[in-house]
Amino acid sequence: MPHQQILILFGLLPVATNISTWWNFGSMLLACSSMQVLTGFFLAVHYTANINLAFSSIVHITRDVPYGWLMQNLHAIGASMFFICIYTHIARGLYYGSYLNKKTWLSGTTLLIMLMATAFFGYVLPWGQMSFWAATVITNLLTAIPYLGTTMTTWLWGGFAINDPTLTRFFALHFILPFGIISLSSLHIMLLHEDGSSNPLGTNSDIDKIPFHPYHTYKDMLMLSLMVLALLTTVAFFPDIFNDPENFSKANPLVTPQHIKPEWYFLFAYGILRSIPNKLGGALALVMSIMILLTTPFTHTSTIRSMTFRPIMQFMFWTLVATFTVITWAATKPVEPPFTAISQAASTMYFMFFITNPIVGWFENKIMKYN
């Protein structure tokens, strides 16, 4: 009986009639999360968290374990799919003013931070050359913290350099954090249903709502099918498209790769970090590139919620998307002219979007008042 009541509630969940395809990414993220936990479990069964055996255990999974290649590729490419969905989900939230649901937005930003931490720990686990050096560079940023930095870094590493204890604790963290993500996702969904979803018009949709099932479930299923198709096509035909060639070599602390870079979904933050010549300044900019999302609910000054009717903000939003892409591209290049200057200009423009947001809102209010 209780499960029937849940189904009835799910079917009767009132949702605005006019929400577009951009609102489908929440359910796609839920599907990605489920797939990552399942494939991750099957990989963890065969993985060995030891610096001498980790790389060999990945080779063993892909070569010897039945369908191990499928699990490994689904997990790795699934992570990229996860980030494509989450960045689109955040972009939709910024464009349509979903951040004004403060509790939902703040829990979502916390989820993003947890997801990025989990993905970072996971990238270290294969113990390839790029995994090792990316971990060295990123964890070394902790030393920029005054007084406590060196102690914290040694504590995180479990020694005076990245070694076996580091890999063991990164595996433990990579295994446990997804359960935190699942818990926080449940809270995120509960907080969302407290206020209800926004819509493309940014208006109150209480007078025009339809049941979630069957209308939006079928709509969600279409996008889920397309996502699964894209994922399986990539896994089958381009399994190494997101991999770094350096990571096919076992980690060697004595040989530094020519160009150290993390996975593509961290490149925008890494590009911002690299654009500042000062270590502490770069580390702060890296943290702020994510944390600045927390400010958006408090800096919204416009009387209009959605950017649908805000042409100036639309221009700024698409400039932000272009800036994000440029920083990602520049971060793949060596630290030399003109890439350094491009990164610095793009990083400045990235932060300018969030800084000028309240000023543009105030300006729009003035124009509307005079009209």
Curated annotation (Swiss-Prot):
Xref: Pfam families: Cytochrom_B_C, Cytochrome_B
Example of a GO biological process term: mitochondrial electron transport, ubiquinol to cytochrome c
Electron transport found in the keyword field: yes
Positions of a ubiquinone binding: H193
Keywords linked to the UniProt accession: Electron transport, Heme, Iron, Membrane, Metal-binding, Mitochondrion, Mitochondrion inner membrane, Respiratory chain, Transmembrane, Transmembrane helix, Transport, Ubiquinone
PROSITE patterns on file: CYTB_CTER (PS51003), CYTB_NTER (PS51002)
Residues binding heme b b562: H75, H174
Annotated Gene Ontology cellular component terms: mitochondrial inner membrane; respiratory chain complex III
Protein localization: Mitochondrion inner membrane
Single GO molecular function: metal ion binding
Binding positions for heme b b566 per the UniProt entry: H89, H188
Ranges that cross the membrane: 25-45, 69-90, 105-125, 170-190, 218-238, 280-300, 312-332, 339-358
Cofactor: heme b
Keyword Nucleotide-binding: no
Membrane topology: Multi-pass membrane protein
Cofactor binding description: Binds 2 heme b groups non-covalently.
Family recorded in the similarity comment: Belongs to the cytochrome b family.
Subunit structure as annotated in this protein's UniProt entry: The cytochrome bc1 complex contains 3 respiratory subunits (MT-CYB, CYC1 and UQCRFS1), 2 core proteins (UQCRC1 and UQCRC2) and probably 6 low-molecular weight proteins.
Miscellaneous comment text of the record: Heme 1 (or BL or b562) is low-potential and absorbs at about 562 nm, and heme 2 (or BH or b566) is high-potential and absorbs at about 566 nm.
Task performed by this protein: Component of the ubiquinol-cytochrome c reductase complex (complex III or cytochrome b-c1 complex) that is part of the mitochondrial respiratory chain. The b-c1 complex mediates electron transfer from ubiquinol to cytochrome c. Contributes to the generation of a proton gradient across the mitochondrial membrane that is then used for ATP synthesis.
Full protein name: Cytochrome b
Lineage start: Eukaryota, Metazoa, Chordata, Craniata, Vertebrata
